[in-house]
Amino acid sequence: MVSGITGRKSMIKVITLQHIYGKNRERMTDLLKTLVENELKNLEVKVEISITPENWAEFSLEGEDEEVSANFLISRYGTPAVKAEAGRTYRGFLQAFGDNAFLVNIGIPVRVETEELIALGSGRPAQLASRFGLIPHLPVEVEVFEVNKKVKTRFTKKQLDLWWSWKKAGTDRVIVNAATRSEIKSAIKKTGHGRDIYEIERIGLLEHAIVCRENTDGPGIVAAIGPRLKSEMGVVIGDAR
């Protein structure tokens, strides 16, 4: 049976790497259930969702296509790691920015130390996070390159390239967590900034990037929509502006 799957006869349970967080956990859970049901709509399977004590989304799958559905969910969302192995790449999310490291949760907590953040430029972790608009709960990809007395981790080239593409862009980006796309669109519309943005990029389930137009300042968008959203926000100032 595939890792991440537990089951008994006629039902399979899958714990995913989708973290349920924020003040409105019920809303986030319902949103994820609706999203997954839509993704599995062509399969014969009944979907139920619950939250584990560690705040991961767990799916109970029942039906003719339950195993196919389980494999899809593991591929789509990943499963929490129970240990870190050298040479492996893991999906996870940003948890916090300490004095000497980015803290990442891959199912277990790992640290990306300051010396592994050189690719983002000079500065302390909190300064680097601010420069690239990074906030807690953003999905990330890390590589474990050593496991001895402690686990040594770095961000993958793919991850670093994404952040640098934001920084080198000709427009600002506003990074938002704990909000749906429709909530962000509504906040932008109600504050009269509909013509000031190009699009809203999806980063995760409730994590998005608002792509500003060339003459729009990201901090101004944050000041306008911030009071309407129960979110943390980061701003990436495009260097090519």
What is each model feature region?
Residues 5-74, 132-241:
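OB-fold/S1-family RNA-binding modules
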Residues 29-30, 101-103:
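Ser/Thr-Pro-rich, acidic low-complexity intrinsically disordered regions of eukaryotic RNA-binding
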Residues 60-62, 103-109:
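Short, acidic/hydrophobic/Gly-rich beta-strand patch recurrent on exposed beta strands
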Residues 67-89, 129-131:
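Short boundary/loop segments of OB/S1/cold-shock single-stranded nucleic-acid-binding domains
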Residues 84-100, 140-142:
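Structural detector for short beta-strands of small beta-barrel domains
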Residues 109-133:
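Beta-strand/loop nucleic-acid-binding surfaces
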